[in-house]
Amino acid sequence: MAVTTLVGCGNKGAKADGGSSDAAITVMSREDGSGTRGAFIELFGIEEEENGEKVDKTTDEASITNSTSVMMSSVANDANAIGYISLGSLNDTVKAVKIDGAEASVDNVKNGSYKVVRPFNIVLGKKASDAANDFVNYIMSADGQKIIEDNGYIPVDEGAAAYQASNAKGKVVVGGSSSVSPVMEKLVEAYSEANTNIQVDVQTTDSTTGVSSTVEGSYDIGMASRDLKDDETAQGVEGKTIAKDGIAVIVNNESSVDELSTDQVKSIFTGETTSWSDITK
């Protein structure tokens, strides 16, 4: 199985400019355990059912990146690359392609024309501390939801009330998804000013670790950029949606490709389509 794992600041062997319409497509995917990968393969039909089980059909030729930032830098340094990231993390180092004619934007997620959308969830145990519950109340308040919107994500409660601090004190450890982490850090920054009695630390891993570590008790609050699975909630945790986020399909800025269909994305990531000429001709 020809899998390359990229964990540094990009693919050093790739060419950063030029690109060719007949070049081989460099497929870049996230690692197993990534909530973004889980949502991506589901939304594009890359996950198929075989013998009663769901199977990830991502091509074995895909290079595997272990975080949002590595995915972006890897695509930015390979003119023939294609990958996917949180819409809220998109910047001008890469180009998001239209999907089925719809641009990847917050407005299009809101109006329903851009359909590649997933939830941002926090994960809570049944015995969450008072401090953890206070931070959750902040996230779901008008104050927290405004921070979510201001950072390019879609709030889930536009009619929320203003935050009111409790008497709780202590430390809260939040960990999990590298897609949720950027907006969580913004929330923590603002929360630290709204309530000086509670310290919140953020640890960036992946969605699956966010769930399992909350189950184990090493995280007070987990982060998952996907819905929780039945076997996860059966372990005594629950997911709470704090925001919605699009998944942007990204290519190098030098790429001539500006738009793909859902079927074309599936064909590329399952390895059926391997050359850009099959897309651009």
Where do the model's predicted regions map?
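C-terminal motif of bacterial Sec signal peptides marking the signal peptidase cleavage site
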Residues: 4-8
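Exported/periplasmic ABC-transporter solute-binding proteins
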Residues: 9-281
